[in-house]
A protein has these predicted regions:
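Amphipathic, interaction-prone secondary-structure segments
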Residues: 2-38
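Short secondary-structure subsegments characteristic of cysteine-rich extracellular domains
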Residues: 31-54
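Low-complexity intrinsically disordered segments
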Residues: 49-99
Length: 99
C-alpha cells in the first residue's frame, strides 16, 4: 500500500509535532526523491508555529486565507527555518528532517 507520508512525523521535547516531507510530489526543492533538499514541505503542526518565517511561508502561499495554521501545508520552506522552529520547541526527540 502506497503512503504519501514517507517521513515519520517529527516530535519535539515540548510535545510540538509536525510532518516534514521531501520527495518528487511534495513542495520541496529540488523536486525529486533523492536529496539533498534545500526546501521542504511541512504540514499539520500540532500547534501554530512560532518561527515568523515559517508562518510567512504559509501566508505567502495562501494569500488571503486566514484558515487554521494547524490544518494546512507549508510549501517550499528552507531547511534552516524548520531547524529553528524545532529548536524553539526544545529540539527533536522523535523523527528527523528529510535529507
Amino acid at each position: 500500500m502506497f503512503s504519501m507520508n514517507r517521513n515519520p512525523r517529527i516530535v519535539c521535547a515540548d510535545g510540538f509535532s509536525m510532518s516534514v516531507q521531501a520527495f518528487s510530489s511534495s513542495y520541496c526543492l529540488p523536486r525529486q526523491d533523492e536529496g539533498p533538499h534545500t526546501h521542504m514541505e511541512g504540514g499539520f503542526p500540532s500547534s501554530p508555529p512560532l518561527d515568523p518565517e515559517l508562518l510567512e511561508s504559509r501566508e505567502n502561499a495562501y494569500e488571503g486565507n486566514e484558515g487554521d495554521p494547524c490544518e494546512t501545508v507549508y510549501p517550499y520552506v528552507a531547511r534552516e527555518v524548520f531547524e529553528r522552529e524545532f529548536e524553539l520547541h526544545g529540539g527533536i526527540v522523535e523523527g528527523r528532517l528529510p535529507y
